[in-house]
């Protein structure tokens, strides 16, 4: 009976673990700039205007994974920071879109845009600059 209980517990733990897709940071292929993780974090935390940031929808798993891996923050911490910046008039928050396909469209339309998508969604319309 004990091996069955152990197996059941192991299955529950594995099933409860979040399954995140691998996130990549992308830019327009015409953009030849090399970009570091710190530079990307600064753009997404309102400390730099080097790029126009595109955010995935609030509450999405990929958004949480991106902020954790690139900015070392929860998505909720980043949202709170942006609320403060907007309230004080110091910055405009990233444009929010609903999916990786929408991020790719926004990147294709703006050579200064930067965004993040699942690695599996990468195609020739975008250039990967970071795999955190």
Task: Show which residues each predicted segment covers.
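Sec/Tat signal peptide C-region and signal peptidase I cleavage site
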Residues: 15-21
